[in-house]
Amino acid sequence: MSTPTPTPTPITFPSATHTLSAHLYHHPPTNTTPTTLTPAIILSHPMTGVKEQTTTLYATHLHAAGFTTLTFDAAYQGSSTGTPRGLEDPFQRVEDIKAAVTYLSTSVPGVDSSRIGVVGICASGGYACFAAASDLRIRAVATVSAACVGGMCRCGGVGRGLREDGGVIGMSLEGARGERNGVNWDGEEAPKMFDAERVLQDGGEGGNVDSFFKAAAEYYGTERGRHERSTQRVPLQSYDRMVVYDSFAFMRLIAPRPVLMIAGEEAETLHYSEEAVRLAREPKELFVVKGMGHFDLYDRLEVSGPKLVRFFREALA
């Protein structure tokens, strides 16, 4: 018998000058447990994603295990405020996570502010690590299919390793310069990072990067992950922000708080998790899920879900 999916409480909270739209899955105090405090976990969505996709699946799974959980749309994205729509600002994304910690710590009855963890998925895996490095309120951090948007913009994509490419960097900066001096894209006019419909029609092409976007289209362009507010449109002025950002530069500062990085054995992004764990100090763990790729872990939780429960039960005890 399956457990019914809980109905979240829609809430908003501030992050810098923005108002973020969020869903709270709460275990509030009751008449029989008025002083009981529960640990809480923040779930942060992938680049071009929204809170109703993969983070909801992980939030409900962790909520069923006894945690209060919170999902939210990043500034400029989903139902949150900010223009240009779709802007990917890594430093604002990090602030959004810290703002979520503040909200849980100060505004949700029954949450133990000393036991707050974060799960970041894809690009948010990088943002979660960066936030934890400088925010001691985050007691534990876990990632699923982590990636670094800065690394992608400097090296030429997810499957190009960690070696920077001057030509790729130049293209990123030129695109941003042109947009800043020309069209002020809104959410409908900004270019798509990838066109899910076209990729699905064409069937993808060979090579690591192409296979990544084919798998992305199979998630974002089908019932698995399609959502009207997840448009994959990214203003070009995002790229000069991303080029100078490094998700994992300060991994060493997270210790002695624990780090768990979950990645698929077949994921083109696996090298990001490997490098991040190499840079981190104990306690740390790289957990590789056999037979799975990057996007498989977005909605196949049979291995990653229980692993996260075990990790946070120990880390937030």
Give the residues covered by each predicted segment.
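Conserved alpha/beta-hydrolase
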Residues: 61-81
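The serine-hydrolase catalytic nucleophile loop
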Residues: 47-60, 74
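Alpha/beta-hydrolase fold nucleophile elbow
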Residues: 109-122
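Catalytic histidine-centered segment of alpha/beta-hydrolase-like enzymes
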Residues: 292-302
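Alpha/beta-hydrolase-fold enzymes
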Residues: 129-218
